[in-house]
């Protein structure tokens, strides 16, 4: 079905509408063989709080952006090659329901759908697209993924030393390797993580020692408590993942 739609006029028009919604600041999306599979609003668990984002699933990429005017204008376009994507379900917890992790070597994050059916459909379509791409290319699934960042609201004290309380002066930082929220003294070191950046990035003391010695880092569970997260319907925001990329 995807091959049949690839060169159809209807598919070209749908992709053209998406390009127009992102405007000149967005990347061109129409290329031979690309098909728009589906779209919808998902709630992305960002560093500061959950935020509504518009997602577009193509047969080879996943695109998302900030909602400026619903179905008319989006900005801060992000494009994720599906070949590098792995997804895992997230258990329901409080108001955070119907979620899953989108994991890539560069960046990983959690998203939440409005219903269990919507979640199932998204995960099924993403898995099918990834599977088809890997089969065509003969490549193997990506082995290593960037850590999912623990939201700021989940840590009132440093997750490494368990002592430093966060204040306007004692700022929160994120380790790029484990995703923990850590204090300045516990994250003074930097280490080169080629999949994330061409320059050394901030890592916590624990991860720095493990990386420096070549030791295997223990896997981190992403089912941490998220109590108190603001998960209302008023999270449409014109700021975005700048707060995910800052320290």
Swiss-Prot record:
Pfam families: FYVE, PH. Residues 213-247 are annotated as: Disordered. Residues 35-131 form the PH domain. Residues 237-247 have a biased composition (Acidic residues). CDD domains: FYVE_PKHF2 (cd15755), PH_Phafin2-like (cd01218). Its main location: membrane. A zinc finger (FYVE-type) spans 152-212. GO terms for biological process: endosome organization; endosome to lysosome transport; protein transport. Residues 222-236 have a biased composition (Polar residues). GO terms for cellular component: early endosome; early endosome membrane; endoplasmic reticulum. Keywords: Endoplasmic reticulum, Endosome, Membrane, Metal-binding, Protein transport, Transport, Zinc, Zinc-finger. One of its GO terms (molecular function) is phosphatidylinositol binding. PANTHER family: PLECKSTRIN HOMOLOGY DOMAIN-CONTAINING FAMILY F MEMBER 2, PLECKSTRIN HOMOLOGY DOMAIN-CONTAINING FAMILY F MEMBER 2-RELATED. May play a role in early endosome fusion upstream of RAB5, hence regulating receptor trafficking and fluid-phase transport. Enhances cellular sensitivity to TNF-induced apoptosis. The FYVE domain is important for binding to the endosomal membrane. This is Pleckstrin homology domain-containing family F member 2. It comes from Danio rerio (Zebrafish). The lineage of its organism: Eukaryota, Metazoa, Chordata, Craniata, Vertebrata.
């Amino acid at each position: 079905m995807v091959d049949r739609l690839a060169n159809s006029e209807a598919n070209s028009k749908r992709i053209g509408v998406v390009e127009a919604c992102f405007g000149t600041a967005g990347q061109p999306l129409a290329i031979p063989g690309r098909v728009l599979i589906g779209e919808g609003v998902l709630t992305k668990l960002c560093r500061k709080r959950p935020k509504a984002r518009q997602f577009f699933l193509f047969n080879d990429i996943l695109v998302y952006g900030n909602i400026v005017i619903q179905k008319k204008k989006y900005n801060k376009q992000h494009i994720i090659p599906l070949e590098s994507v792995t997804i895992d379900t997230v258990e329901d917890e409080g108001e955070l329901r119907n979620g899953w992790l989108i994991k890539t070597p560069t960046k990983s994050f959690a998203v939440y759908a409005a219903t269990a059916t919507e979640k199932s459909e998204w995960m099924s379509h993403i898995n099918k697209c990834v599977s088809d791409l890997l089969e065509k290319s003969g490549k193997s699934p990506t082995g290593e993924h960037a850590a999912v960042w623990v939201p700021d609201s989940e840590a009132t004290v440093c997750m490494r030393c368990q002592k430093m309380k966060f204040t306007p002066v004692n700022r929160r930082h994120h380790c790029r390797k484990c995703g923990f929220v850590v204090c300045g003294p516990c994250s003074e070191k930097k280490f080169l993580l080629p999949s994330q950046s061409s320059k050394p990035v901030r890592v916590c003391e624990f991860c720095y020692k493990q990386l420096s010695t070549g030791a295997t880092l223990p896997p981190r569970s992403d089912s941490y408590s998220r109590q108190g997260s603001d998960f209302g319907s008023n999270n449409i925001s014109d700021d975005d993942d700048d707060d995910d990329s800052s320290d």
